[in-house]
UniProtKB/Swiss-Prot annotation:
Feature: DNA-binding region: 107-184
Signal peptide residue numbers: none
Protein known as: Mating-type locus allele B3 protein
DNA-binding as UniProt keyword: yes
Localization terms from the record: Nucleus
Top-level division of the source organism's lineage: Eukaryota
Keywords of this entry: DNA-binding, Homeobox, Nucleus
Annotated segments matching region Variable domain between B alleles: 1-110
PROSITE patterns per record: HOMEOBOX_2
Biological process, per Gene Ontology: regulation of DNA-templated transcription
Any one GO CC term of the record: nucleus
Role according to the record: The B locus has at least 25 alleles, and any combination of two different B alleles yields a multimeric regulatory protein, that activates genes responsible for the pathogenicity and for the sexual development of the fungus within the corn plant.
């Protein structure tokens, strides 16, 4: 076309159709060629338009071809613009999702936090918001969703475990602030002032060459840690204060990264789940009642009543005759009136004679021991005397009031 100095309507239409077909083929390497052809055609057309014959039909076809090229060119321009816009949106959305999920590089993740922990996302959020670990409602919902998704993805065998809820996450953050020591640092080294705690966290992160949260990068540089500590304490900083703060800070970071309770492996949960007996099909589900939940108090069994049967009572008075066997002795009701408590001669009256006291044939035996030889070689031990009224006839006859009244022999 450039070689032909003379331009006709037919050639002009042919050039437009060629450019249109090349546009539709959409080859990247042809785009500079198409641009150059359009530029040459634009330069030559004004010079020859006035000299061209008036052919309405040919002119109409040229207009239609030019309109189609314009539509195709605008469509490609929009495609390119939309492609750039979509790429930008994808990059922005991906960055936002990664920030919400707090995804870090594999090396840093292995050093800082284990993704296998059930509370990984909550701990990571706590670690990135140390100056104010109070998530908003929107952040809580996002953390709950991420935790449930990651738990279902990492441990599909534990799908029976109920999903995390927002109120459980709220309780976790309340306990985390207290158990990690964050509340202790806020109270002791920041006077329970959130603004002072914010300055303290920024100063500590800057002094330890740790990355600060994104929300703090736009603010003024953090102060020196010693200056902030001295200002928060309201007195000159001592080595003991500095060491105490460093110990509390290290303990807090260690708890956030590696919770003691969550260091337990999945096998513990599997073991606990396996230990629970599954009910057999068709068996009724046991209902836990108050009586079953709290077993009845164990009561001491009632003591059996002691037998009131009177044991045979023998005299506790030591026997003078130790050679005699006392294991075969018995007491009888007839001997209840006899007394062996006092067998000495001191009880006798001075006016009485021993010749009047001879109730037994063997007087020497009865004086030596309260044991009496009964019929059939049965030995009977006398019981202590029971006091009784003295009979006047006995006194008159010269008998002793302390004598045994009756002795029965079996």
């Amino acid at each position: 076309m450039s070689r032909d100095p003379k331009l006709s309507l037919s050639k002009f239409l042919e050039c437009l159709n060629e450019i249109e077909h090349e546009f539709l083929r959409d080859k990247v390497e042809h785009r500079p060629v198409l641009v150059r052809k359009l530029q040459e055609l634009q330069q030559k057309t004004p010079k020859h338009v006035a000299k061209l014959p008036h052919e309405p039909e040919m002119i109409q076809q040229i207009h239609q071809a030019a309109h189609r090229i314009d539509i195709v060119a605008q469509a490609f321009i929009r495609f390119d613009q939309k492609f750039v816009s979509l790429c930008s949106e994808i990059v922005h959305d991906t960055t936002k999702v990664m920030q919400e999920a707090n995804v870090v590089s594999p090396g840093e993740g292995c050093r800082n936090l284990s993704e296998d922990l059930p509370a990984y996302h909550m701990r990571n959020h706590f670690l990135h918001t140390l100056e104010n670990p109070y998530p908003t409602q929107e952040e809580k919902e996002g953390l709950v969703r991420l935790t449930n998704e990651s738990t279902a993805r990492i441990r599909p065998s534990n799908a029976i475990r109920p999903p995390l809820e927002v109120h459980q996450l709220t309780l976790w953050f309340i306990n985390a602030r207290r158990r990690s020591g964050w509340s202790h640092i806020l109270k002791k080294f920041a006077r329970e002032d959130p603004s002072r705690m914010k300055r303290l966290v920024r100063a500590k992160l800057s002094s330890s060459n740790q990355s600060t949260p994104p929300s703090l990068t736009s603010e003024k540089p953090s102060d020196d840690l010693d200056v902030v500590l001295s200002d928060n304490l309201g007195r000159p900083l001592t080595l003991a204060d500095k060491q105490q703060f460093e110990d509390d800070w290290a303990s807090m970071i260690s708890w956030i990264k590696y919770g003691v309770k969550e260091k337990v492996g999945d096998w513990v949960y599997d073991l606990c789940a396996a230990s629970k007996k599954t009910p057999k099909p068709g068996m009724p589900r046991p209902v836990t009642t108050v009586a079953k939940r709290h077993p009845a108090r164990k009561t001491k069994p009632a003591a059996k009543p002691k037998s009131r049967t009177a044991n045979p009572r023998a005299s506790t008075t030591p026997s003078i005759d130790s050679t005699l066997d006392s294991s075969k002795l018995e007491s009888t009701p007839e001997l209840s009136m006899c007394s062996t408590a006092d067998t000495s001669f001191s009880t006798f009256g001075s006016s009485l004679s021993m010749s009047h006291y001879n109730p037994f044939q063997d007087g020497n035996d009865i004086l030596q021991s309260p044991t009496v030889k009964a019929r059939g070689n049965r030995k009977v031990k006398a019981l202590p005397k029971r006091a009784g009224k003295q009979q006047p006839d006995e006194v008159d006859n010269g008998k002793i009031p302390f004598l045994c009244l009756s002795v029965a022999f079996v």
